[in-house]
Amino acid sequence: MKMTKNFKLQEFIPASVYEKYGDNSTWFIDDRLPTGAQIVRDELYTKLVKPRGEYVDLQMVINGKDRDESGFRVPSTETGQPLSQHRFGRAIDFQVLGKRNDGAWEHIPSLEIQRIISIPTVWEKLRGIWTTMEGGTLGWTHLDMRYRPDSEYSKGPAIVAIPAK
């Protein structure tokens, strides 16, 4: 099931959950999450592909390949923290790959993602949906939709990213 221009429902849901519930798996994710992911993807595409010409395409990876719990996490999972926003269907962890002119895909460092998303105009687009971004792990960035009107996240960007080693 297509959620946005570039994301399918299966990217936000573990395969086992989708197999059981199919398109009803939308029950398990916050409606704002695909929208936030699409905003981030569009902004990264605009900043990394169009002006530079260094990349000819961009892929934002949530679930898929060896990743199955980067979106919604079932209550019984041992992945992450017990009260993680993932368990409420309000978070994704993602990596970004850029396709070079020679056809090879390469990982775009989390610090580069942090730099782009920290641009005030990008953050304004995300702020309307109460977004938190962090990257306190290696090689990926966290995006969630928790409601925090009195925190620093409601006033501007709060992004931390640590590049993969």
Identify the meaning behind each predicted range.
Residues 32-80:
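Extended, low-complexity, intrinsically disordered C-terminal regulatory tails
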Residues 82-92, 96-165:
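Catalytic cores and adjacent binding grooves of peptidoglycan-active enzymes
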Residues 1-52, 146-165:
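Extracytoplasmic cell-surface/polysaccharide-interacting catalytic and binding patches
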Residues 21, 35, 52, 63, ...:
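Feature targets compositionally biased, intrinsically disordered low-complexity regions
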